[in-house]
Amino acid sequence: VAHPPGYPAYLVLARLFLLLPFGSPALRTNLLSAASAVGASLLVADAVRLAHGGRHRIGAAAGVLAGFAFGLSPLLWSQAVITEVYGLHALLVAASLRALPVWPGAQNSLKAFAFWGAITGIALANHLTSIFLVPAGLGLALFGRACPELAEGSGRRMHSLAGAGIGLAAGVALYALLPLWASRHPAINWGNASTGSGFWWLVTGEPYRGLVFQAWPYLWSRLQAGAGLWVEQFGAVGLVAGLSGLLITTRQPAVLRWILLWLFLCFSVFAIGYNTSDSYTYLLPAFLAFAIWLGQGLAIWLEAAGSWQRVLTALFIVALFFNAVPAMARVDASRDDTAERFGRAVLEGAPPGAIIITSEDRDSFALWYWREAGYNGLGRRDLIVVVERLLPFDWYRDQLRWTYPDVQLPARPGTGWADELIRLNDRPVCRTFPDQNEVLICDSLLKPASDRLERIASA
């Protein structure tokens, strides 16, 4: 069970990709990210095509260019080559937009809102910020005029609203998998969602709620960084094209314009206000909305270009190329073997049955992976991984006792906890130092703690 809010939709799909008969577990889940990014880019292309009339050649060409612009944007590209939830987040946001009955040629069926609700519910089961999609769909069901059925009276509108609600409930029901998984006591079991309090702690993202809208002291610097990111994603030409698509609405349905603007503003404000160093990843849906505007702007340019359409298309492809080449160097992770070298050093250097104390996300997550997946056939299920920063949580201490029943743990965490751990167990105790050349330092079977142990425990 993953860290809050649990990400059940991502975990279900990741388990399917883990069934692939080749590559390491990391490679297989990386393929999920890559496939999601490709899918999101294809949906951007389709959205631009539909917004321009469906079968119009210019709309199709502009859609293809917009899809490539989004797919080659550094942020989406960086998420497509790692095991993370944000590629899938972009795909599900794009799918939710595509499912809304606002596009030319959309079927006038009340089932459309149920389908939209199911996609959006799955998006919520992947990332909680997908909540920004909900007002768009529910508002359309209540007040929209995209479908003739919606104009026939309040009864039809209430049926549409009910369909959307049923679909949402069906998608969000994926969260019910978390207590089932947690009841099996897996080695990684954030929050122990098999209890009511643990489930609520997990799915509401309680540890991170204090970070929401807490970055306002850094507002100006974040706005500057955000503006720089926009240019970095699409280049100066793409930026102008996107603004053209936003401001010049010759073919775009009015309701679609307002929905895209709503999503753009909501995700941008949330990303700027979320007080973490990597909050820029929450801008992906805003970049997606901008990519659709970019495609619409390109369509306007191509219509105005007349006989120069091919020249304009070629120039934009050149601009894409010059934006993508430096991005490729930044996002290329094929030569980054930091986690692999760390895992190899720990697995090969740890004494049999050692207790390994970690303190950060990067060494904790890496060791959880390497303990389970092994390295070149070297599995180390004998190692006991203890994440020091999680020890204040009752659910984590209970999980340790369930996962490692032979290990005696101190009753309560606190100062001298590592010394007490060594006193209670006839096992080597090690600590990871991911920033140092010597990433693992161990003290084997020392009772009472020596000076060297005290140095390690206080590090």
What are these regions (language model features)?
Residues 11, 19, 23-26, 30, ...:
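Aromatic- and kink-enriched transmembrane "portal" helix at the membrane-lumen/periplasm boundary
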Residues 31-55, 95-99, 292-296:
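Transmembrane-helix motifs of polytopic, lipid-linked glycan transferases
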Residues 44-72, 91, 107, 111-112, ...:
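Transmembrane-helix signature of polytopic, membrane-embedded enzymes
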Residues 51-57, 80, 96-116, 120-123, ...:
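Membrane-interface transmembrane helices that cradle and orient dolichyl/undecaprenyl
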Residues 102-105, 132-169:
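Perimembrane helix-loop-helix junctions
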Residues 147, 231-254:
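Hydrophobic, aromatic-rich transmembrane alpha-helices
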Residues 344-355, 359-365, 374-459:
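C-terminal luminal/periplasmic domains and tails of membrane-associated envelope-modifying transferases
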